[in-house]
Amino acid sequence: MKEFFGIGGYARAPEGYMSFGHLFFVTALMAVTAASAVILGRRYRSRPRRDKKRVLAVAAFLIDGLELFKIVFLCFREHNPMQWLYLLPLFLCSIQLITIPMAAFGKGRFEEAALDFVLIFGLLGALLGTYGAGQNYAAYPVLSFDNVVSGLTHAISGFCAIYIGVSGLCSLKKKNVPVTFAILSGFCLSAYIADVLIPYNYMFLIRGDGTPYDIVYGLTGGSPVFYPLTVYGLFLVYIAVFYLITNIIKRRKTTQQGAPRHGA
């Protein structure tokens, strides 16, 4: 058990990023995540909204409970009570630690925007935090506390995104766009301030660190101004495109349903 938890350091060498072990583990995890989200989403689709949100409430307790345990344990393992400074929920994927509870327990526009936010970024964050987690899988063995807990929290984010879509909880109304933008902007600003003060690399606003963000970092020449602004801008574009495509699909469905049926 000491080896799994990394107490005293890991004796095993990391299998490596994009190794068979890495890909097998995250693919199995994502397959179970997607299957369970679709099954539960279909089961709850016709249930009252209150019942649908109970599933999100359970997911919120699970993801926050796991993360809280991880923070406390890592402070103990690293013999550093300030280790939590490097474990704040200020990455794209860990933002879900806050937005999933907002979606589960919130009311009104903030609830709607939080549901939209989890749908839009939950699965993306899950994929980036598993398949794209080059930093983690290059540093720790696949079946280790660091990677297993990270995999589980990312899987819960992905589960919530798929479940929200399948169960019909999301609205993706155009009026929610400014609130969704505001949620993202608040987290990005907080992450950048933390990056400067700690210092650290929350939201990968300082550098790519072996993730797909390295592409943007290279294209901007690592500019301390244009790189974070480009990353932030791409997030906003992604949100806008997601809403745009969804509303186009909705409009087409409405048009088709309202069109007269010839030969009836």
Q: How would you name each of these model-derived features?
A:
Residues 43-56, 105-114, 167-178:
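Membrane-interface helix-boundary motifs at transmembrane edges
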Residues 39-47, 243-258:
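Membrane-interface capping segments at transmembrane-helix boundaries
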Residues 102-160:
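Membrane-proximal helix-loop-helix units in multi-pass membrane proteins
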